[in-house]
Amino acid sequence: MGCILKGGGGLHSRLAVGAVLLAAGEARRMGGRPKPLLQLGGVPLIRRNLIALSGAGVDEVAVVLGHRADEVELALLDFPVTIVRNPDYERGQMSSMHAGVAALSARLDAIIVAMADQPLLNAEDVIALIGAFKKRGAASAVVPYVDGERGNPIILDAAVREAVLAGDANFGCRQWLAAHPEQVLRMDTGNRHYSVDVDSPEDIDRFVEQYGHPLRWPPDLAT
């Protein structure tokens, strides 16, 4: 069961919101260095994303680890979250998503699926996503789109969670969204916080060029 974030829930007490933060990837394009530990302003990206979720009033978070899990977990020791170690992380993101969703409590009305490599995401962005979900009408999911490009995080209702968990390990949120486009609400926005992530050294250089803020590895991972 996902741990309750201290102080969480106040902004959205009428809607119980949980989150899965995916941080298990192999980061092959980064030479195996774990992207969640890349730092902006001296703060690891995984911590920045947890701060954003907590600041938005998310009630509980499950963080899924895999590649170099021991190192990444050290960045989380003072956060009241559930740590989920996915032994099958090499099979891809869907297995990690399954593991994280299964770790959250059944009482939730909505689940955010977030990535740990988005340097710009903040609490206001998550609040806007939750706000769009509350106004979704008959839709079961809200997905941000930035200039026509799909972004992250996304937010799903409890029924989608159950559908995903009922499927096999190769059936995840992306497959559900593709199979049920009529139940997906697009949140069209010009806010690039939802679309900027860091997958490669070139992305790091591009981020510095566009935003003027360096992304740095901690000393033990610097080359």
Where are these regions (language model features)?
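Conserved beta-loop-beta/alpha segment of the NTase-like Rossmann-fold superfamily
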Residues: 90-165
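Conserved alpha/beta core of the MobA/IspD/sugar-nucleotide pyrophosphorylase nucleotidyltransferase superfamily
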Residues: 2-16, 162, 168-223
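Short phosphate-binding loop-to-helix
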Residues: 71-110, 170, 174
